[in-house]
Swiss-Prot record:
The modification Phosphoserine is found at residue 200. Interacts with MUC16. It is found in: Cell membrane; Golgi apparatus. Belongs to the mesothelin family. Glycans are attached at residues 57, 388, 496, 523. It is a lipid-anchor; GPI-anchor. Membrane-anchored forms may play a role in cellular adhesion. Megakaryocyte-potentiating factor (MPF) potentiates megakaryocyte colony formation in vitro. The keyword Nuclease does not apply. Keywords: Cell adhesion, Cell membrane, Cleavage on pair of basic residues, Disulfide bond, Glycoprotein, Golgi apparatus, GPI-anchor, Lipoprotein, Membrane, Phosphoprotein, Secreted, Signal. The keyword Disulfide bond applies. InterPro entries: Mesothelin, Stereocilin-rel. Residues 262-286 are annotated as: Required for megakaryocyte-potentiating factor activity. This is Mesothelin.
């Protein structure tokens, strides 16, 4: 009774409060919009009382006018006018409700000659007996194949009479079908009884995969037996691959425990990981935990005999509300290690996560976390911040699950937010980064060290530095290298010469001036890429001779970098005479006869351009004219 009231209110200039109330009712699902009032095109129906009976040409009516015709008005039209209306509806692609289609079909007392001119879905409501003879029925069911059969429920009388008529028309005898027969049946193939599934599994199972509604009990048993038998097209479950599991998605609820146990567990795990990245499986995930769903589920009792005694393969046959009602959260928590071996759908995993969330509102214990497996992919950073993760084995297990999901698409060099949060919780729980932890983290995410703050890096022991590779430091900034360099220097202190330089080279972005001076005496031949990453304040005090010794044959590269820091700033602090000794044509040094007084080294690094470098300096003429006069 709510719909007749809702329609004029929504279509009129009602009060904002009333409109908001109706919008709320629609959004909560307590009031459903009538399909007789608006089609799938989103058009609003116009009042049509008497419109159909008066115009000389129904095709002149707009789609908006045609959309909302009442059945009572159609019943007063002649057969010819009804046919004219049906043709106009098809031409203007007007989407009709089931009742409107049934009403039109009832008024078409004689079978139409031009089926192509009628709305496709209207044919579902016509009596197939009216199209007798091979040519007539073939033409009729060829059109039915393209219609939306699921507009009719499986139990509807119109749908029940279509399948036997179609089988007779296509000359099907017995239960053996060809691939051409299945194609000819279209959506009606989803209604074929179990005996057809048993005898024609090779051609029928691939069609049943895409059937929108659940199979009936007879069909399920036949499909299960066919799959367990290992015949074509899928073969024995023990030989299934990830692509086989993909192809069987629509039939997963049909699989029994013997079938599931026969599938290689590595294949199940790989398929689960691959499917989690498929957007088509992610779309409905969050809908099942909306408040309205939760309220409805909580009020539903577990059906007799379905209370779960253990977490096993039988649960994949449970509907979402049955999982919520029949699986005890405490049982789930103690048997989490079994979940990954069972091919739950991602909607079912949502229900399991919801149950754990209710059992542990303050965060999961580590005994549960370490067995989350693929359920970890459903966790948000907010969920993970409640955890206390201290076991390296737990961290390894969850990082293994995330292989293939490690990097964020928005920032490819950064891990996904939930992974970054997990690592953060682990590091805080452990208190320091030992070698085993660092090995694990850098193997998973090479840039991990550079994602830590200087304060967090201070917990890295020098002994762990041996596990750091050059690429692990690519994105570190000077503040981070300032912390890591002293640790690296301590770790490699017993090495000499070129071996020491090879190990320390990646950390030199944090080296002070005195260490660079020491390296210049060892003929290390530092490359320009490393030199350009040195701290500017550490490079500025170096003399031309020290830089020449530090770079060795690579000193010629200074010319190409003379406009970039730190080379630019270093040039501005050198005497031009000294720069000229390099023979590189470097310009911008201090002219002869000038004395430079640097008032503030800190200000000199502030970036303000001046004669002798970035920062305020006082330049005075060394041989002042006054002294000459004197």
């Amino acid at each position: 009774m709510a719909l007749p009231t809702a329609r004029p209110l929504l279509g009129s200039c009602g009060t904002p409060a009333l409109g908001s109330l109706l919008f709320l009712l629609f959004s909560l699902g307590w009031v459903q919009p009538s399909r007789t009032l608006a089609g799938e095109t989103g058009q609003e129906a116009a009042p049509l009382d008497g419109v159909l009976a008066n115009p000389p040409n129904i095709s002149s009516l707009s789609p908006r006018q045609l959309l909302g015709f009442p059945c009572a008005e159609v019943s007063g039209l002649s057969t010819e006018r009804v046919r004219e209306l049906a043709v106009a509806l098809a031409q203007k692609n007007v989407k009709l409700s089931t009742e409107q289609l049934r009403c039109l079909a009832h008024r078409l007392s004689e079978p139409p000659e031009d089926l192509d001119a009628l709305p496709l879905d209207l044919l579902l409501f016509l009596n197939p007996d009216a199209f007798s003879g091979p040519q007539a029925c073939t033409r009729f069911f060829s059109r039915i194949t393209k219609a939306n059969v699921d507009l009719l429920p499986r139990g509807a009388p119109e749908r029940q009479r279509l399948l036997p008529a179609a089988l007779a028309c296509w000359g099907v005898r017995g239960s053996l079908l060809s691939e051409a027969d299945v194609r000819a049946l279209g959506g009606l193939a989803c209604d074929l009884p179990g005996r057809f599934v048993a005898e024609s599994a090779e051609v029928l199972l691939p069609r049943l995969v895409s059937c929108p509604g659940p199979l009936d009990q007879d069909q399920q048993e036949a499909a299960r037996a066919a799959l367990q038998g290992g015949g074509p097209p899928y073969g024995p479950p023990s030989t299934w691959s990830v692509s086989t599991m993909d192809a069987l998605r629509g039939l997963l609820p049909v699989l029994g425990q013997p079938i599931i146990r026969s599938i290689p567990q590595g294949i199940v795990a790989a398929w689960r990981q691959r499917s989690s990245r498929d957007p088509s499986w992610r779309q409905p995930e969050r809908t099942i935990l909306r408040p309205r769903f939760r309220r409805e589920v909580e009020k539903t009792a577990c059906p007799s005999g379905k209370k779960a005694r253990e977490i096993d393969e039988s649960l994949i046959f449970y509907k979402k509300w049955e999982l919520e009602a029949c699986v005890d959260a405490a049982l789930l928590a103690t048997q989490m290690d079994r979940v990954n071996a069972i091919p739950f759908t991602y909607e079912q995993l949502d229900v399991l996560k919801h149950k754990l969330d209710e059992l542990y509102p303050q965060g999961y214990p580590e005994s549960v976390i370490q067995h989350l497996g693929y359920l970890f992919l459903k966790m948000s950073p907010e969920d993970i911040r409640k955890w206390n993760v201290t076991s390296l084995e737990t961290l390894k297990a969850l990082l293994e699950v995330n292989k293939g999901h490690e990097m964020s698409p928005q920032a490819p060099r950064r891990p996904l937010p939930q992974v970054a949060t997990l690592i953060d919780r682990f590091v805080k729980g452990r208190g320091q980064l030992d070698k085993d932890t660092l090995d694990t983290l850098t193997a998973f995410y090479p840039g991990y060290l550079c994602s830590l703050s200087p304060e967090e890096l201070s917990s890295v022991p020098p002994s762990s530095i041996w596990a750091v590779r050059p690429q692990d430091l690519d994105t570190c900034d000077p503040r981070q290298l300032d912390v890591l360099y002293p640790k690296a220097r301590l770790a490699f202190q017993n090495m000499n010469g070129s071996e020491y330089f090879v190990k320390i080279q990646s950390f030199l972005g944090g080296a002070p001036t005195e260490d660079l001076k020491a390296l210049s005496q060892q003929n290390v031949s530092m490359d320009l890429a490393t030199f350009m990453k040195l701290r500017t304040d550490a490079v500025l005090p170096l003399t031309v001779a020290e830089v020449q010794k530090l770079l060795g044959p690579h000193v010629e590269g200074l010319k190409a970098e003379e406009r970039h820091r730190p080379v630019r700033d270093w040039i501005l602090r050198q005497r031009q005479d000294d720069l000229d000794t390099l023979g590189l044509g470097l310009q911008g040094g201090i002219p002869n006869g000038y004395l430079v007084l640097d008032l503030s080294m800190q200000e000199a690094l502030s970036g303000t351009p001046c004669l002798l470098g970035p920062g305020p300096v006082l330049t005075v003429l060394a041989l002042l004219l006054a002294s000459t006069l004197a």
